[in-house]
């Protein structure tokens, strides 16, 4: 049997991983500017953490979860999204306590798991960057969080990003709209897909989110949820829109956008860009004011978003965005003969301890092959060590671009390499 990675997973090799690290680094720096701290939750949770929060009727729970019973007969699931585990942690660790400063701002970066058909930018194990903000019902929090995502995309160089915006209102608004949608769709039930016929009974708003052609036709003239917002919900949405305009963040209203998770209320949003003449969602999120209470905590407003790293990197690649990655080695040490092996080891370590990236030959190859390795690694400086260098206590440093050389003592290299390096590459 040929051993291979499971379907829908990937090996992220060093060249690609450098791009991942760059994107993750920009995200961390951006979130830090907005005073977010990192949280790391388990990759698996009790099944109820996900099923109760995400919604029993969602595709995630009914079709896509990796769940199993462990040896203690506990129902466990690999996390399919990041918000529910973070909310569970917020409640379990009592981050709602009065001594904890509010709002509590958290971000996460990690693997998620969904059993779905693998395709470009979508895998069964995928990686998500997400943020959650707890404790503020202020519409300014909605806008700040949306602006943070927009800021991140600007820093990464993503082109032509469009913000799609909608409001699901509060519980009363959603109840009124739910009934209006049932009244509108019921006469055309037989024309809906089988999934949407089921959704019409369980959660009719999800019909709006369907990708099936027949469902899109059915909802084309459906009533708008914005017509059913009560005074409180309308005021919140109006405030969000006006503050987005203050920050000069353009948006379009998308009344058919409901998001695929059941816990949202009030503001929901997606950032969409065009790739190969197709629209791709980069990031999505919204407000979830009832979720903390649902997990057994006090009533606590929340707002957040998630974005898929694989899709983000795909979009950057398709749009031709060049990510700055590792520039190569500072130093490559060419080793001539076994006599120089120990000295090369000591010198390599001494230079690394002064903050430089260094590689050396371990394979006993001919000098020409070692110089080719130095070129392949894009080494700035090459140091050649052989028997004569060790006997004299001096090494030859060569600028790998200009080929200019300088001779320096081992003592100088071991104690003041920064000055020597700067002189060599100037």
Curated annotation (Swiss-Prot):
GO terms for biological process: histidyl-tRNA aminoacylation. The gene is hisS. Its EC number is 6.1.1.21. One of its GO terms (cellular component) is cytoplasm. The keyword Protease does not apply. This is Histidine--tRNA ligase. InterPro entries: aa-tRNA-synth_II (IPR006195), aa-tRNA-synth_II/BPL/LPL (IPR045864), Anticodon-bd (IPR004154), Anticodon-bd_dom_sf (IPR036621), His-tRNA-ligase (IPR015807), HisRS-like_core (IPR041715), HisRS/HisZ (IPR004516), HisRS_anticodon (IPR033656). One of its GO terms (molecular function) is catalytic activity, acting on a protein. Belongs to the class-II aminoacyl-tRNA synthetase family. It comes from Streptococcus equi subsp. equi (strain 4047). The keyword ATP-binding applies. PANTHER family: HISTIDINE--TRNA LIGASE, MITOCHONDRIAL-RELATED (PTHR43707:SF1), HISTIDYL-TRNA SYNTHETASE (PTHR43707). Pfam families: HGTP_anticodon, tRNA-synt_His. Homodimer.
